Amino acid sequence: MAATGEALTTQGYISHHLHHLQVGSGFWTVNIDSMIFSVILGALFIWIFRKVAATATSGVPGKLQCFVEMVVEFVDDTVKGIFHGKSKLIAPLALTVFIWVFLMNLMDLIPVDYLPYTAQVLGIPYLRVVPSADVNITMSMALGVFALIIIYSIKMKGVSGFVKELTLNPFNHWALIPVNLALELVTLLSKPISLGLRLFGNMYAGELVFILIAGLLPWWSQWLLSVPWALFHILVITLQAFIFMVLTIVYLSMASEDH
């Protein structure tokens, strides 16, 4: 499948499927497809959970209500086991992160040609449908968590306490402030970097495997590899959403500790 309609080589097929629908150029390039799908999936999450909340009954619940209640209880128990501070934001944030990332990851199970081919028929040359396989999306989410880490640190320790934590830890001596600052900044900055790149790396690799299977094998034999990989990838999808949520809670719990 090519943007101009001609037959593609295997290399061209893979390259085409890894190309985003973009506007702008250079640093200001925006991946429109990633933004659209992430917003749609976020809206889907809000709609489903609001619908369940509005129609919840104390009687015999439906299947959707049971599922939502199970997820909410699971996330709430996870937060209680990790976050020991007092905040009404953490549990809703954890739920949002878990479901939103899971839905973005879940897009990887859609056959690689379905939506891009449909988009091409509509005159859209490129389309990538897995937002969490876009480093811009994962790092944006990680930077949002990083901002909350700074906010919670300052809220609990004050500006002076936060500065002292960066400059007088682990060596409590003014002469070692440069060493302390270097060590603490590396530790602090590694949190959003590892958070964003871990999710991106796993989902990009998963997407690439599906594309390689579709690009290298004839259509009648692709299921021999794609079905087992999809079944395994269901575990990866769920696990990566869970890890992102847990690390978010852990980092905010560490920031909320009053030393």
Swiss-Prot record:
Primary subcellular site in the record, as a coarse category: membrane
SUPFAM superfamilies the UniProt entry points to: F1F0 ATP synthase subunit A
Name the UniProt record assigns to this protein: ATP synthase subunit a
Gene3D superfamilies the UniProt entry points to: ATP synthase, F0 complex, subunit A
One of the GO BP terms on file: proton motive force-driven plasma membrane ATP synthesis
Subunit record text: F-type ATPases have 2 components, CF(1) - the catalytic core - and CF(0) - the membrane proton channel. CF(1) has five subunits: alpha(3), beta(3), gamma(1), delta(1), epsilon(1). CF(0) has three main subunits: a(1), b(2) and c(9-12). The alpha and beta chains form an alternating ring which encloses part of the gamma chain. CF(1) is attached to CF(0) by a central stalk formed by the gamma and epsilon chains, while a peripheral stalk is formed by the delta and b chains.
Gene Ontology cellular component terms for the protein in this record: plasma membrane; proton-transporting ATP synthase complex
Keyword Transport annotated: yes
Function: Key component of the proton channel; it plays a direct role in the translocation of protons across the membrane.
Sequence similarity: Belongs to the ATPase A chain family.
Keywords noted in UniProt: ATP synthesis, Cell inner membrane, Cell membrane, CF(0), Hydrogen ion transport, Ion transport, Membrane, Transmembrane, Transmembrane helix, Transport
Cross-referenced PANTHER family: ATP SYNTHASE SUBUNIT A, CHLOROPLASTIC (PTHR42823:SF3)
GO molecular function, one term: proton-transporting ATP synthase activity, rotational mechanism
UniProt xrefs under InterPro entries: ATP_syn_F0_a_bact/chloroplast, ATP_synth_F0_asu, ATP_synth_F0_asu_AS, F0_ATP_A_sf
Membrane topology summary: Multi-pass membrane protein
Residues spanning the membrane: 29-49, 90-110, 134-154, 208-228, 230-250
Cell compartments where the protein resides: Cell inner membrane
